[in-house]
């Protein structure tokens, strides 16, 4: 895959987010076709990971997208395959270390600067995607970062 093709996938992830999809959906859908996964099904599978998993502000949805894509790329399919499982875990840990280095945290609440359990877990209602939302949230940049990290992984394979 060329650099240009990978750049287009990174941009597709950002475009997905700007169209209203969650962080995880945006990242996974940008690469899902590489694994024979229909984009609609990819968005459904990734839907609950938005807002730091169900808007609980836990692991960043964009980061969860990296994890899901690594599973599609190199996840083991036999329960007894410890070597395959370990290889997948190594890739996840390496890519998430890069994400943490770039973004300061893997945790949605920390990335958003939300302090306190009650404030971070106050509602299951998705935020309205207004101009103010996009202006004040770092999420599009985090989606871009996650997609770029995964694209670079694919390039280096």
Predicted stretch roles:
Residues 15-19, 26-37:
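Long, hydrophobic N-terminal alpha-helical segment
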Residues 2-4, 30-48, 118-123:
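Acidic-glycine-rich active-site phosphate/pyrophosphate-binding loop
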Residues 29-33, 69-70, 80-157:
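Amphipathic alpha-helical interface segments
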Residues 23, 60, 108:
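Short cysteine clusters
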Residues 65-75:
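DPxDG-like acidic metal-binding loop motif
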Residues 59-65:
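Membrane-inserting effector segments that mediate pore formation, membrane fusion
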Residues 49-56:
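Transmembrane alpha-helix interface/packing and boundary motifs in multi-pass membrane proteins
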Residues 1-18:
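Polybasic, low-complexity association/targeting segments
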